[in-house]
């Protein structure tokens, strides 16, 4: 019998009341969500497991410090025995039952509360506690979770819920080849302007709204061929931008990797990969107190770069020494066209001429960030990722730290990566010709 005042017995009573109190399949999931959170936290507290650590264990597979998971069952049994020895309550059978069932029940409830609020999970969890899958407790933990996933999601899946591949990033630089996709994005169409606007607001020169007979006939023939105007997929574009912004705002994001993924998923994956890998800037370590003080008083010199392709848009127009990705990489530039800013004559918006993005940013070559000086070296392209050897030489734009009234603001240096890392040992290396004279 449960003992009054015992936290383990109290948690067992709550769990038993929940498992037997409602008929399976007739409970409103939204109405009991608060009770499930409380029940989950109560069981974890009895098991002496931190909630955040358990969530990381369920979804990311991070080990729990309190449970030495292993391939053999005695590890789990020794953990249970340790919990029993710390309890003074005489209801040992109830304690043992809660400890054995509790870790699985918390796993099921965590998946329900944070991933998939399906009544199927509630039904499975209740039947599990009532002993309908009692023989599962004789099997390994991973096998029990695999059967739970198979029952709920109808697929073969095992622990943890989210798999993280820690392979080298270069292994995901897919070859430049066209993929045969089975998904086709539907294109939308809208009524043409002449059905929605008067002639004075259409694309007709002012003062020439009246057409002659031949002009009217031609316009009528053209209108009969334009019952609608294609406008692409604005909804897909909106969803893609929202998903991309949301993924970039978090430290981690999970994107499916498959040749059969919908086109919108592929575009999001490629953009996240490119934004995370491409760069035209290298941070230069400051090794001299003189350079430190010069950066503090230096008026910043700005450069312009694209937020998507990460090319510097006001440097690189010419023959500069640079590194590039291998021709088999997705980011290899085959056209090598000039990079600059294009300005729309109608809206005034600025676009990157290299990739067409309107995500244009500016940054300074020198900056004080939380009291720490920063020096940035800018390359002529976006392949800073390929600076993999200390002897590789590249042309860099660096800030001029001089104080001449007609200072040019920046200097061009051809340096190896090793020279760049030790450049700040001598402040004169970061001065233009006018400041040195």
Curated annotation (Swiss-Prot):
This is Uncharacterized gene 66 protein. Its main location: host cell. It is found in: Host membrane. GO terms for cellular component: host cell membrane; membrane; viral tegument. Belongs to the herpesviridae UL49 family. InterPro entries: UL49. It comes from the Viruses. It comes from Alcelaphine herpesvirus 1 (strain C500) (AlHV-1). The chain crosses the membrane at residues 102-122, 272-292. Coiled coil: none annotated. It is a multi-pass membrane protein. Keywords: Host membrane, Membrane, Transmembrane, Transmembrane helix. Signal peptide: none annotated. One of its GO terms (biological process) is viral process.
């Amino acid at each position: 019998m449960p003992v009054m005042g015992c936290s383990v017995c109290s948690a067992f009573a709550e769990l038993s009341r929940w498992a037997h109190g409602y008929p399976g399949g007739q409970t409103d999931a939204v109405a009991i969500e608060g009770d499930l959170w409380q029940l989950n936290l109560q069981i974890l507290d009895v098991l002496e497991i931190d909630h955040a650590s358990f969530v990381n264990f369920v979804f990311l597979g991070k080990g729990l410090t309190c449970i030495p998971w292993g391939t053999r069952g005695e590890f789990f049994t020794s953990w249970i025995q340790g919990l029993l020895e710390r309890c003074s309550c005489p209801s040992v059978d109830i304690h043992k039952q809660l400890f054995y069932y509790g870790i699985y029940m918390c796993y099921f409830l965590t998946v329900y509360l944070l991933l998939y609020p399906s009544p199927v999970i509630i039904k499975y969890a209740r039947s599990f506690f009532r002993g309908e899958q009692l023989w599962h407790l004789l099997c390994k933990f991973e096998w029990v979770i695999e059967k739970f996933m198979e029952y709920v999601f109808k697929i073969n899946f095992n622990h943890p819920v989210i798999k993280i591949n820690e392979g080298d990033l270069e292994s995901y630089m897919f070859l430049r080849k066209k993929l045969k996709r089975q998904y086709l994005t539907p294109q939308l169409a809208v009524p043409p302007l002449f059905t929605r606007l008067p002639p004075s607001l259409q694309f007709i020169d002012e003062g020439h709204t009246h057409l002659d007979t031949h002009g009217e006939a031609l316009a009528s023939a053209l209108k009969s061929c334009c019952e609608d105007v294609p406008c692409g997929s604005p909804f897909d574009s909106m969803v893609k931008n929202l998903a991309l912004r949301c993924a970039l705002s978090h430290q981690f994001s999970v994107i499916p990797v498959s040749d059969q993924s919908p086109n919108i998923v592929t575009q999001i994956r490629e953009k996240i990969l490119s934004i995370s890998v491409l760069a035209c800037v290298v941070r230069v370590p400051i090794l001299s107190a003189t350079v430190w003080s010069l950066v503090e008083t230096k008026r910043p010199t700005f450069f312009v770069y694209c937020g998507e392709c990460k090319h510097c848009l006001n440097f690189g127009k010419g023959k500069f020494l640079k590194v590039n990705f291998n021709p088999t990489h997705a980011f290899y530039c085959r056209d090598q066209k000039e990079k600059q800013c294009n300005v729309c004559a109608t809206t005034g918006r600025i676009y990157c001429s290299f990739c067409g993005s309107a995500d244009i940013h500016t940054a300074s070559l020198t900056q004080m960030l939380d009291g720490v000086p920063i020096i940035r070296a800018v390359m002529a392209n976006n392949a800073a990722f390929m600076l993999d050897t200390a002897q590789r030489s590249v042309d860099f734009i660096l800030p001029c730290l001089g104080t001449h009234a007609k200072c040019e603001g920046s200097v061009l240096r051809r340096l190896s990566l090793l020279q760049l890392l030790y450049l700040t040992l001598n402040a004169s290396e970061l001065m233009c010709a006018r400041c040195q004279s």
